[in-house]
Amino acid sequence: MPAISRDEVAHLARLSRLALSDAELDQFAGQLDSILSHVRTISEVAAADVPATASPDPVTNVTRPDTVVPGLTPDQALAAAPAVEEQRFMVPQILGEGE
């Protein structure tokens, strides 16, 4: 017995505001029946002894310790900038005057 009937597919199509032809109704009924069959098979797997998890991989902390390293001086950072004004990067204006 199919898990979903052609009438149920037509009802879902109406709810979704989809206009389906008779051939499409038959096609989608078969496809949805196959999908629901696979879901039913998966739900029958005995997973009572498997703990719930958000990820199949073990979660480990992959961060490294913070170490202080010297950074660029303002002059070094601005040296490669195409335009500088008052020790700041100059960029094209993207908003109007009043915005």
UniProtKB/Swiss-Prot annotation:
Entry keyword set: ATP-binding, Ligase, Nucleotide-binding, Protein biosynthesis
Its catalytic activity?
Answer: L-glutamyl-tRNA(Gln) + L-glutamine + ATP + H2O = L-glutaminyl-tRNA(Gln) + L-glutamate + ADP + phosphate + H(+); L-aspartyl-tRNA(Asn) + L-glutamine + ATP + H2O = L-asparaginyl-tRNA(Asn) + L-glutamate + ADP + phosphate + 2 H(+)
The cross-references to Pfam families, in alphabetical order and at most eight, read: GatC (PF02686)
**Molecular function GO labels:** asparaginyl-tRNA synthase (glutamine-hydrolyzing) activity; ATP binding; glutaminyl-tRNA synthase (glutamine-hydrolyzing) activity
UniProt record, GO biological process: glutaminyl-tRNAGln biosynthesis via transamidation; regulation of translational fidelity; translation
Q: What EC number(s) has UniProt assigned to this enzyme?
A: 6.3.5.-
User: Cross-referenced InterPro entries, in alphabetical order?
Assistant: Asp/Glu-ADT_sf_sub_c, GatC
Assembly and interaction partners: Heterotrimer of A, B and C subunits.
In the record, the note on similarity to other proteins reads: Belongs to the GatC family.
| PANTHER family, per database record | GLUTAMYL-TRNA(GLN) AMIDOTRANSFERASE SUBUNIT C, MITOCHONDRIAL
Function of the molecule: Allows the formation of correctly charged Asn-tRNA(Asn) or Gln-tRNA(Gln) through the transamidation of misacylated Asp-tRNA(Asn) or Glu-tRNA(Gln) in organisms which lack either or both of asparaginyl-tRNA or glutaminyl-tRNA synthetases. The reaction takes place in the presence of glutamine and ATP through an activated phospho-Asp-tRNA(Asn) or phospho-Glu-tRNA(Gln).
Identification of the protein by name = Aspartyl/glutamyl-tRNA(Asn/Gln) amidotransferase subunit C
The gene behind this protein is gatC
